[in-house]
Structure formats: C-alpha cells, structure tokens
Amino acid sequence: MSITKDQILEAFAAMSVMEVVELIEAMEEKFGVSAAAAVVSGGGEAAAAVEEQTEFNVILTAHGDNKVAVIKAIRGATGLGLKEAKAMSEAAPVAVKEGVSKEEAEALKKELVEAGASVEIK
C-alpha cells in the first residue's frame, strides 16, 4: 500500500500542533537530521547594499592648473562668492555639493573636469 503526498498532507492538517511537533522530533531522530531553518548571516546588509544610491556627493580632489576656471565653475554650481569659492578650491579634497541626484552630480563633475579639476562622485 502506497501513501500519496496528498494523503500525508491531509494527515498533517488533521493533527494538532503538539502532534506535529512530536512527529517532527521522531523524523529528526529516525533520519538523523535537524528541522531547524538555516540562518543566513548578513542578509539584511546585502539587501541594503543592492539598493541603488539616490543621493551623491561631488568631491573636488584637486583644483588642477587652471584654478580660475575651477573657481568660476564652483561659483556657478554653488552660488558662493569669489572668496568662498576660492577657499573651497584650495581646501581640496572638499565636497562641492552634497545630496544631489546622479544626473546633477555627473553634470557638475563634467563641468569641473572641463575646467581642469580632479573630481570624484561618492
């Protein structure tokens, strides 16, 4: 006599929770296995890392040889005065803009690189 999967499922459905626990313990003993779920460590961190970054920081790493053009580009992007933009260019590495979209960060990077600066997006 062969028992089908459906018959086994029906038998499980008719059991109380205590009977199912006892059955599982008996199966663990008979087959030498454990019914404990495998724990995947770090799963939450990996899922967070997979999410696409939405805010970027544009970091000026060096002003390069054409300092005047870089200062003008900084002023245009940030609205800072001449003195503040000059101080920012001399303080490299420094964040020119923080929390901007990817498109805005790429556009600013392109503008600063064309002016002669070294730039990173983080």
Swiss-Prot record:
GO biological process: translation
Pfam families (alphabetical): Ribosomal_L12, Ribosomal_L12_N
Keyword annotations: Ribonucleoprotein, Ribosomal protein
MF terms (GO), sorted A to Z: mRNA binding; structural constituent of ribosome
NCBIfam families tied to this protein: L12 (TIGR00855)
Family classification: Belongs to the bacterial ribosomal protein bL12 family.
One CC-aspect GO term: cytosolic large ribosomal subunit
Subunit structure: Homodimer. Part of the ribosomal stalk of the 50S ribosomal subunit. Forms a multimeric L10(L12)X complex, where L10 forms an elongated spine to which 2 to 4 L12 dimers bind in a sequential fashion. Binds GTP-bound translation factors.
Alphabetized CDD domains for the sequence: Ribosomal_L7_L12
Listed name of the protein: Large ribosomal subunit protein bL12
InterPro entries named in the record: Ribosomal_bL12, Ribosomal_bL12_C, Ribosomal_bL12_C/ClpS-like, Ribosomal_bL12_oligo, Ribosomal_bL12_oligo_N_sf
The species this protein was found in: Shewanella oneidensis (strain ATCC 700550 / JCM 31522 / CIP 106686 / LMG 19005 / NCIMB 14063 / MR-1)
